[in-house]
């Protein structure tokens, strides 16, 4: 059985695959270090009230989006995407983003990133090692296959995704997952490219002109109402 067939089978069965050591060059290592440095510089400028409890902030990687995508976008990668999605890369609008996990207190509750019938692919590029202590993504393998109520989801067996710099995590948006708490006390970054079916004639690569790295607003706003909602969400997420 070829690697490609095995990867496809694993993706269909579990809703995600991990491609180990996919990007390996000195330039990538340099980019990752510089990216993290710039993210932390922005992070340190923030008023950390909103998102401080959730501890997950969305990142727009700016100029790094394109540079890292160039390292990723090999013939092998195109074939893998085509195998999984049954579509060519040019059929997608590709949107770049990322997540900074500085959640030192709570796990998120399990959720999906899309409605069941409206799924898309998410490719996470691992730009720094992810281990047990720094808030790995926790997935519920196989939960992408059918529409599940939340009470059924929480009885499924979970798996934490530990990964090394240069690994890729490809998952479907309707796989149930959550961010876990980062007890390393160092904010941990994970980049993401979202592959949505294109709207125009040709696939749009949104990050072509995206120059400035930004930390975006979190789920909750930096105001009293947002803080109350956030408190409720983190402590009683099973009700939410």
Labelled PLM ranges:
Residues 1-13, 20-110:
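Non-heme Fe(II)-dependent double-stranded beta-helix
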Residues 25, 116, 176-177:
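Glycine-rich nucleotide phosphate-binding loop and flanking beta-alpha elements
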Residues 103-162, 200-209:
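Catalytic core of non-heme Fe(II) oxygenases with the double-stranded beta-helix
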């Amino acid at each position: 059985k070829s690697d490609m067939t095995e990867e496809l089978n694993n993706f269909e069965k579990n809703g995600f695959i991990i491609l180990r050591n996919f990007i390996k060059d000195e330039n990538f290592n340099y980019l990752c270090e510089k990216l993290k440095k710039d993210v932390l510089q922005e992070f340190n400028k923030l008023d950390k009230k909103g998102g401080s409890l959730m501890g997950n902030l969305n990142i727009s990687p700016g100029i790094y989006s394109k540079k890292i995508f160039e390292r990723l976008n090999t013939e092998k990668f195109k074939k893998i995407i085509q195998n999984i999605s049954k579509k060519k890369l040019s059929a997608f609008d590709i949107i770049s983003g990322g997540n900074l996990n500085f959640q030192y207190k709570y796990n998120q509750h399990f959720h999906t990133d899309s409605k069941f019938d409206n799924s898309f692919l998410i490719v996470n590029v691992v730009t720094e090692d992810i281990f047990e202590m720094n808030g790995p993504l926790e997935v519920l393998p196989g939960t992408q296959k059918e529409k599940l109520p939340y009470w059924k989801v929480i009885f499924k067996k979970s798996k934490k995704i530990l990964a090394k710099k240069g690994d890729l995590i490809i998952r479907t948006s309707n796989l149930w997952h959550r961010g876990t708490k980062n007890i390393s006390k160092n904010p941990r970054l994970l980049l993401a490219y979202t592959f949505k079916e294109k709207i125009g004639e040709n696939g749009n690569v949104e990050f072509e002109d995206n120059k400035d790295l930004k930390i975006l607003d979190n789920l909750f706003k930096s105001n009293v109402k947002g803080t109350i909602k956030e408190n409720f969400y983190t402590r009683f997420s099973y009700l939410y």
